[in-house]
Amino acid sequence: AGLGYVGARGLWINGSYGLGVIAHELGHNFGLHHANFWQAPNETIIGAGSSQEYGNPFDTMGSGDIDNATGLQGHFNAWYKWDLDWFSATQVQVVAQAAQSGSFQLYDLEQPSLGGIHGIRVPISGARDYWIEFRPVAGGVLAKGAVIFWGYPTAQESNLLDTSPSTTTATDAPL
């Protein structure tokens, strides 16, 4: 466990010196909040629900960790990488809501050196955007499909959306 100042220097690590804990606390120093999971009732994806803190199992700022068994390598999601200016303008495709359609090829979020689009952003309000990313190198369920989540520009946090709402777990969220 640890504690990191959000948007400021300084962090504490208490007992667990794993790379995942260090990466998570450094994320707070970079200004990031937790990567959460949107739990909506009645088998809906985006209906009224609640944000489950740390609920994104695929993100370092959630409950994701560096795990060689699952292939997770301690990455932040596409919204966080974009917010930190780790992606160039050409690596994120902004799709204006209802004004633009098209077919876009997503490249692996964890391989930015490949060029191409690594995240799709769909602004839906001044307070929230849809984000889509693909992480096949991570393996497991992430190799099977894209992940969709909300990014909140004013709060620097995110909510993973469950595209398999008939279950209560976030681990089957990829398309």
Predicted regions and their residues:
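Zymogen propeptides/activation segments of proteases
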Residues: 111-175
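Extracellular hydrolytic enzyme modules, especially secreted metalloproteases
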Residues: 1-139
